[in-house]
Amino acid sequence: MTLGQQAESLAQGYLEQQGLTFVARNVRYPFGEIDLVMRHKHHWVFVEVKYRSANQFGGAIQALSKAQIGRIRMAASHYLQTHKLDVPCRFDVVAIEDAQIHWLVDAF
């Protein structure tokens, strides 16, 4: 298991402990990828997981670019259309740094 996969598993477990329900992982399209798809009450939650072992080159949150946010939004839109879902959604980020988990709800 790669470090990225380990971080996604850790994030998934953490979010499940917070009351979210797992739906899918690593949803890939040619134009973007969604790390985790979860449900929280009436919302579908598209989660980007960022991992950094140290923040000497900027923390996990700083690793999320505007271009990447655009690709995630496009992938989420496609996911909703493909699954014929007309539901409220949000975009969360789980940042894992120095073995600490930071959950940013409705991050973008």
From Swiss-Prot:
GO terms for molecular function: nucleic acid binding. Coiled coil: none annotated. It comes from the Bacteria. Belongs to the UPF0102 family. This is UPF0102 protein Shewana3_3881. InterPro entries: Restrct_endonuc-II-like, tRNA_endonuc-like_dom_sf, UPF0102_YraN-like.
